């Protein structure tokens, strides 16, 4: 008997970021790629809606931010900003809607 194997679908960081951006724009968020020439490791995207600014670092499923990326996220938080990271569109939606638990770097 022929056995069929499930094809593992690999999702890239770019695919998550693209789908997430589309969802955000469709739901009224101003969304821009975020870069800072003098600083490496800043979050990938800036989102703005109703006076709320959120920075999000995107990762492919199963990956986590680097130490430098964590430092940037924590720096933004220390100044009262909202910053987090995601490895899925679903989590990005939770972050933007403010119904998530902040993730913290491993101890």
Which residues does each PLM region occupy?
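Catalytic phosphate/metal-binding cores of nucleic-acid and nucleotide-processing enzymes, i.e., regions
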Residues: 1-107
